[in-house]
């Protein structure tokens, strides 16, 4: 028996006008965790869609070999029969169905011509217990957090006797503890002989869990080797095709006068009216600085930002000042009129209309300035879109391209472009580089520095401590809805931030 459970040889895949994969070779050893890394657009997802049968045999060139046998998958069912299961970044569970119904959807056991529900739920219980997932099989998926939904997806894959498990950015929306649980599950699966292909931009996770690493760039295999023969910097330079001397381009900022101030601000849960999510928070942000806001998931950072922007349903109390003048914000329109912009942590749900093109998305919050007597100036709309595509280096064949077809990094740049066009005085960035490759991250960091130099007050919320420490001039730490620490960057380190984030005084 070959030591390689999977070989993909000379895989080439073309779309109209684009060669997505160019003679790619990819080999995975039996029972290993193999990380597949590369910038967005490098070809990782395309390669996995070929392996999982989404792109059927005949639409690509090359061979897929499993256990020494050439396979010609014509659909997803074919690949599942060979023991391949893929878990996408955007989960595919049916939220109105129970955990058990989701796990066996389309594969329900039958007894006497009807679905054997007793077996569905007993098997679900067994799978969840094996994975140490504390979830009731009868619970509807809509009542589970993202972390538990991710575990249910894994249980679903294992119910189909998956031998090769593909995970695409599995931790992008997980908390630190959920991420740790997931990585431990994958380590246990490895001990039980399951082979994992792990796609992630989070190199710390890659180096914790992977046995081998393959780097793709521009649709080509650049390097495959044991993890021990890589460093993070080496992986990054192979991914982007150039050496990044520093991951965080820290600029010398000179903080000026206070531009934005929040006083005695309290935000209440919109479903539990008496529950405080943010409790009597006060802070100031200055012109010419990046104010970082750190804290654990669930601390209330996103609710604070969304409430300031007028986009959170819960009741609020307190005062907001802009350039020393008290302002009232009840809706996002109010915030935009005052020059406050908010880039949400979930760009696809709250930042973009993905079925619209680049031009329309950039224009969306700016129709007041693009219109006269309620007539839209289409020439101005085109001119502004082309300007920001050029300035932000948005990779798109045309401003008429649907945003859904852009990479994550370029989608994020479109969101930034629409807010830049609104000429903000204050820009709140919530997880600005989530799900974005290292090259695009570097470009967004440079853009943040440029905005600060232009006099924009930048507030950055991030769950990545290296990002907070690498880009902030000053850091606030939120714990359970309260500010539990404040540090100038010269005095900040990971230990101090985590101490405050976990409730230390």
Curated annotation (Swiss-Prot):
CDD domains: ABC_Carb_Monos_I, ABC_Carb_Monos_II. GO terms for molecular function: ABC-type D-xylose transporter activity; ATP binding; ATP hydrolysis activity. The keyword Cell membrane applies. Transmembrane segments: none annotated. Gene3D superfamilies: P-loop containing nucleotide triphosphate hydrolases. It comes from the Bacteria. Its EC number is 7.5.2.10. It is a peripheral membrane protein. It is an enzyme of class 7 (translocase). SUPFAM superfamilies: P-loop containing nucleoside triphosphate hydrolases. Pfam families: ABC_tran. Residues 6-243, 262-505 form the ABC transporter domain. One of its GO terms (cellular component) is plasma membrane. ATP binds at residues 38-45. SMART domains: AAA. It catalyses: D-xylose(out) + ATP + H2O = D-xylose(in) + ADP + phosphate + H(+). PANTHER family: CARBOHYDRATE TRANSPORT ATP-BINDING PROTEIN MG119-RELATED, XYLOSE IMPORT ATP-BINDING PROTEIN XYLG. NCBIfam families: PRK13549.1. Belongs to the ABC transporter superfamily. Xylose importer (TC 3.A.1.2.4) family. Part of the ABC transporter complex XylFGH involved in xylose import. Responsible for energy coupling to the transport system. The complex is composed of two ATP-binding proteins (XylG), two transmembrane proteins (XylH) and a solute-binding protein (XylF). This is Xylose import ATP-binding protein XylG. It comes from Thermoanaerobacter pseudethanolicus (strain ATCC 33223 / 39E). The lineage of its organism: Bacteria, Bacillati, Bacillota, Clostridia, Thermoanaerobacterales. The gene is xylG.
């Amino acid at each position: 028996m070959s030591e390689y459970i999977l070989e993909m040889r000379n895989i080439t895949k073309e779309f109209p006008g684009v060669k997505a994969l160019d003679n790619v070779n990819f080999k995975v050893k039996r029972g290993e965790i193999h990380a597949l890394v590369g910038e967005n657009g490098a070809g990782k997802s395309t390669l996995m869609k070929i392996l999982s049968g989404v792109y059927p045999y005949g639409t690509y060139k090359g061979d897929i070999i499993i256990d020494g046998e050439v396979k010609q998958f014509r659909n997803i069912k074919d690949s599942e029969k060979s023991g391949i299961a893929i878990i996408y970044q955007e989960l595919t569970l049916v939220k109105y169905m129970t955990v058990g119904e989701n796990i066996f959807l389309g594969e329900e056991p039958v007894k006497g011509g009807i679905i054997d529900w007793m077996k569905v739920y007993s098997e679900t219980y067994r799978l969840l217990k094996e994975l140490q997932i504390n979830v009731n099989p009868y619970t509807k998926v809509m009542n589970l957090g993202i972390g538990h939904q991710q575990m249910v997806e894994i249980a679903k894959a294992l119910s189909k006797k998956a031998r090769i498990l593909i995970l695409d950015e599995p931790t992008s929306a997980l908390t630190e503890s959920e991420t740790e649980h997931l990585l431990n599950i994958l380590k246990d699966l490895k001990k039980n002989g399951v082979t994992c292909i792990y796609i992630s931009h989070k190199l710390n996770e890659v180096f914790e869990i992977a046995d081998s690493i393959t780097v793709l760039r521009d649709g080509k295999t650049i390097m495959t080797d044991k993890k021990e023969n890589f460093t993070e910097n080496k992986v990054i330079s192979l991914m982007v095709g150039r050496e990044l001397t520093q991951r965080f381009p820290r600029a010398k900022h000179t903080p000026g006068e206070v531009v934005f101030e929040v006083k005695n601000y309290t935000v209440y849960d919109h479903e539990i009216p008496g529950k405080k999510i943010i409790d009597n928070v006060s802070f100031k942000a200055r012109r010419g600085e990046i104010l970082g806001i750190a804290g654990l998931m669930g601390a209330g950072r996103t609710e604070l930002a969304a409430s300031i922007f007028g986009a959170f349903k819960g009741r609020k109390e307190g005062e907001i000042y802009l350039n020393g003048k008290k302002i009232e914000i009840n809706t996002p329109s109010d915030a935009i009129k005052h020059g406050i912009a908010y880039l949400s942590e979930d760009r696809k749900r709250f930042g973009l209309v993905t079925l619209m093109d680049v031009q329309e998305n950039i224009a969306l919050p700016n129709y007041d300035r693009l219109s006269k007597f309620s007539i839209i100036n289409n020439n101005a709309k085109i001119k502004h879109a082309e300007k920001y595509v050029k300035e932000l280096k948005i990779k798109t064949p045309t401003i008429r391209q649907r945003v859904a077809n852009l990479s994550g990094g370029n989608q994020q740049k479109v969101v930034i472009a629409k807010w830049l066009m609104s000429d903000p005085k204050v820009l709140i960035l919530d997880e600005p580089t989530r799900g974005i490759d290292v090259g695009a991250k570097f470009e967004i960091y440079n853009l943040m520095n440029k905005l600060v130099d232009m006099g924009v007050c930048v507030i950055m919320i991030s769950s990545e401590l290296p990002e907070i420490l690498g880009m902030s001039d000053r850091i606030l730490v939120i714990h359970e809805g309260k500010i539990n620490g404040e540090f100038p960057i010269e005095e900040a380190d990971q230990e101090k931030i985590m101490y405050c984030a976990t409730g230390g005084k």
